[in-house]
A protein has these predicted regions:
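Glycine-rich NAD(P)-binding loop of the Rossmann-fold in SDR/ketoreductase-type enzymes
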Residues: 86, 90-98, 145, 149-150
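NAD(P)H-binding glycine-rich loop region in Rossmannoid oxidoreductase-like domains
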Residues: 52-94, 105
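N-terminal Rossmann NAD(P)H-binding glycine-rich loop of SDR-like oxidoreductase domains
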Residues: 7-28
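Conserved Rossmann-fold NAD(P)-dependent oxidoreductase catalytic core, especially the SDR/UDP-sugar
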Residues: 100-144, 170
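Flexible, glycine-rich beta-alpha linker
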Residues: 122-124, 145-146, 173-191, 215
Length: 317
């Protein structure tokens, strides 16, 4: 009932997370407006509004906000582990400007609520599931230093807006989200879409960056967007909340699952000399369970197998 009759703006409406957010909002009875820039939206529902423009431009951003009650800020520049420091800095500049403009426009347009994505990269390195209140004990891991500090700054900006305006802010810290409509471009893709693409293409040798022992908390995108909807409805109090699966698996396990699902019988070749990131990343999700009633529903094996089938069907068509 919460989303019915409310108009939600989804920034990054043609992207991975934005597409799934829009569909989840439609399924919840909500009205949806997509903000898109250079790409056409994937969703073709005739009830969905589309606003074209550059949200880094103050006028375009404010125009997209008019008449909106809820904002889900899913737009942003992304890069993979192999990107250069200069590429990372360019992405940080874009994302800082974009998020500042979105928060400013939401304030000016007097929207009811906005959901801002932080990230589990804000956390320092730990070997245990990290809680929300452990953020500032140390800086982010060196491999996430720029990106993690950028996301920390997003939280500070959101806190300022929430404390000075009538806009209610929800903050989520997602783990590694995967699923259909992710970015499979080799120059930008993260680990799961990169592995899926190469498995479906039957790459041989099948090279994997890192030792394979790196541990990650992977969350299916459908579970993630469900957590986002719960957060903006139940916890728009500018208090960060981890949204993850709650347990980690090794990259080696992920590789084995993907290769099996793709029917690609080849031994993976792990290369520890190539760029990788933090050895272990898992988050404590007890707050999400307690405050939101959030429980992930899609196990990693089922989610990865479904993703391989989806990508194989898409590339075959």
């Amino acid at each position: 009932m919460f989303f019915q009759r409310r108009l939600s703006l989804v920034t990054g409406g043609a992207g991975f997370i934005g597409t799934h957010l829009a569909q989840a909002l439609l399924n919840a009875g909500g009205r949806v407006r997509l903000a898109v820039h250079q790409r056409a939206p994937i969703i073709s529902d005739p009830s969905v509004e589309t606003v074209h423009g550059d949200l880094a431009d103050p006028q375009d951003c404010l125009r997209a906000m008019q008449g909106v009650q809820l904002v889900f800020h899913a737009a942003g520049a992304v890069s993979g582990a192999g990107g250069s420091p200069e590429d990372a800095m360019a992405g940080i500049v874009k994302n800082l400007n974009l998020t500042a403009q979105v928060l400013h426009a939401a304030w000016a347009a007097k929207v009811e609520r906005i959901l801002i994505f932080s990230s589990s990269t804000v956390y320092p390195a730990t070997d245990h599931p990290i809680r929300e209140d452990e953020l500032y004990e140390q800086p982010p891991h060196p491999s996430y230093l720029g990106y993690g500090r950028m996301r920390r700054y997003f939280e500070h900006l959101a806190e300022f807006v929430a404390s000075r305006s009538t806009v209610k802010v929800a903050l989520v810290r997602p783990t590694a989200v995967y699923g259909p409509h992710d970015d499979f471009d080799p120059s930008r893709s993260h680990v799961v879409p990169a592995l899926v693409r190469r498995a479906v293409e039957k790459a041989d040798p099948f090279e994997v960056w890192g030792s394979g022992d790196e541990m990650r908390d992977f969350l299916h995108v459908e579970d993630f967007v469900r957590g986002c909807l719960l957060a903006i409805e139940k916890h728009a109090v500018c208090d960060p909340i981890n949204i993850g699966y709650g347990s980690a698996v090794s990259i080696r396990q992920v590789v084995d699952t993907i290769l099996k699902a793709a029917g690609h019988d080849v031994p993976p070749r792990f290369d520890s000399s190539k760029p990788t990131t933090i050895p272990v990343r898992t988050v404590d999700t007890s707050k999400a369970r307690r405050v939101l009633g959030f429980e992930p529903q899609i196990p990693i094996e089922a989610g990865l197998s479904d993703l391989v089938r989806w990508y194989a069907a898409r590339t075959a068509s």
